[in-house]
Amino acid sequence: MKTPRIPIAIQQAVMRSLREHLAKANLKLERRYAEPTLVYQQRGTSAGTAWLEKNEIRLNPVLLLENQQEFIDEVVPHELAHLLVWQHFGRVAPHGKEWKWMMENVLGVPARRTHRFELDSVRQNTFPYRCRCQQHQLTVRRHNRVVRGEATYRCVHCGDLLVAEK
């Protein structure tokens, strides 16, 4: 799927959110952390990721277009908090007490680990498989492993080997 173009007004709103939250953190922590790079190339069902060593935030352009305000209010500070925690505390648990503190006490944003966005537009195709008790949906990756003979999968309920439906 081709990466959609993000309108300049949305990019500006995202950048404004990033800069406002970074300024708040720099003020409260009495530091001058560098502004991270924003990249709109995150794929799959992740809303965003923080690349610690690169000081980079990657955002999912499809989910951003579908959930603009939530990205500005929640996703941007969420990923920024990961970068700030890494720079301030070093290597710690990704959503541990330091991250929660950074989100709530420094950035003033509720600390939620996962988003609740509708994912139909970014979800991968699945392939129907069957056992003796039900139908299963395998991802493209798992289906291809079966086709190449690299893997087999069993039902967690009945233990039967999953077989592709015709």
Curated annotation (Swiss-Prot):
The active site is at 79. GO terms for cellular component: cytoplasm. InterPro entries: SprT-like_domain (IPR006640), SprT_Zn_ribbon (IPR035240), Uncharacterised_SprT (IPR023483). Residues 19-164 form the SprT-like domain. The keyword Metal-binding applies. It comes from the Bacteria. Its cofactor is Zn(2+). The keyword Cytoplasm applies. GO terms for molecular function: zinc ion binding. Binds 1 zinc ion. HAMAP family: SprT. PANTHER family: PROTEIN SPRT. This is Protein SprT. It comes from Klebsiella pneumoniae (strain 342).
